[in-house]
Amino acid sequence: MCIRDSHTYRRMIAQMDEGIGWVLAALERHGVARDTLVVFTSDNGGERFSDNWPLVGGKMDLTEGGIRVPWIAHWPASIAAGGVSEQMCMTMDWSATMLEAGGASADPAYPLDGVSLLPVLRDPAHTFERPLYWRMNHRGQRALRRGPWKYLRVDGHDYLFDLSADERERANRAPREPARLDAMRVDWEAWNASMPPIPDDATVSLGYGAKNMPQR
């Protein structure tokens, strides 16, 4: 990142921080800060021009650099300060979490894909089994995370990684653990069969070309 870009990036971070401060100050001013759940998280992946070290990949990748994001939850009435959780989750879990936190439930006719994280918010040491699935047409990518293990397919090649020892996804364990690979592949395929198919014409653009630009 060049000096000019670094300066712009610092200004963007400062502006974001200031905006979050305004929101939190407004909650305090209205006397509802203690009983309000505030979640700060991110869009998936680093941009293609960024450095996501120590992770590999960025947007349009199902490697960890393309899908792993941070989140911070603030809710003084229910969350103790300073807690850190190892629980795996997805953004869709926040819908279920917010509903449970508010004493509501999803319409049975429209079940949620997410799982409530409320027990984790109240006790960061609490964890539960939470397999995570991904798929995308770009490069025929698919992924499944179960515990520390991750199954990944890119361009027709299957990989198996132990992220507890290899978060950069450099050591493919598939040749050494064929049974685990097969089980995770079958698991992913069963999940995929339960989902609507991805339209054949669902494509992505890795950058702006003339046809993507507004009319001039």
Spans of model-derived segments:
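Polar, surface-exposed loop/tail segments
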Residues: 34-36, 81-144
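Conserved small/polar residues in nucleotide/adenosyl-binding loops
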Residues: 1-5
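Non-transmembrane alpha-helical segments in soluble domains
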Residues: 10-13, 17-24, 28, 95-99, ...
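Short, solvent-exposed loop/turn segments at the edges of secondary structure
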Residues: 33, 50, 64-68, 89, ...
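Long, internal low-complexity/basic segments
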Residues: 94, 146-147, 155-157, 163-216
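Beta-strand elements within well-structured catalytic alpha/beta cores of enzymes
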Residues: 9, 13, 20, 37-42, ...
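A structural signal for well-ordered alpha-helical segments within the folded catalytic domains
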Residues: 7, 14-18, 89-96, 112-115, ...
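Histidine-centered active-site microenvironments of extracellular/periplasmic hydrolases
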Residues: 25-78, 90, 216
